[in-house]
């Protein structure tokens, strides 16, 4: 967005590509952080942009909006989400727990009386939830998700290679090299950045093994969160989980070897959902399409 008048220039992937590359008169902003609103004004502008694209020539059209939110957010944060969406032009706002949306998008039978464990690893938070009868029986969240992993990669390169890189480059390293368990052949990658000593451009070669070690703390936090959730699960639901196992969704589910590591740590079946990146969006879409499901899992505020 432009600093002078706060006009929106780009949204989404196009805006993300500008991170760390904007001139002084343009500001790249993340409206949401750790699953909640970080900047109310910018959030409303972003939502208004989306709704305007939906409206097209129908200027009076005001959509019904369903939004997935972390199960751990407070009532104040829930109202902040509602207010921002209403100000952006929505007719009605319904909130749904993000793990429920992800479970629906992954095709889990959450309306049945049986335990389903979903581990939704997003950008800001990882949520582990036990879901039954279309509701969250138990949920635990931790800030050990994709953004935190990017930060760990930046920190590792700064400490061990005296190299400063941006968050986009860190994400590229994560996608290319990161893993939670040794898989396949040893991989290396050349990374460009700025030498913290000389202040000049510099290139270093890094390995998948050192990135796996750099992300060790983040992966361990996810494992501990899953264990806590399983320990709090009712015995009847625990029996279901032994058979059904754990389903991974969100971008973090694509971390190489994460399913193998979690199986090793929990001794439960673990699988990555089909299209884990979009499970949350697919689940919200199902709620909008199926009125009976919408009434069960989405709550107006």
Go through each PLM region and give its residues:
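Nucleotide/phosphate-binding catalytic cleft detector across ATP-hydrolyzing
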Residues: 1-121, 129-247, 253-301
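Acidic, divalent-metal-coordinating active-site segment for phosphoryl/phosphodiester hydrolysis
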Residues: 126
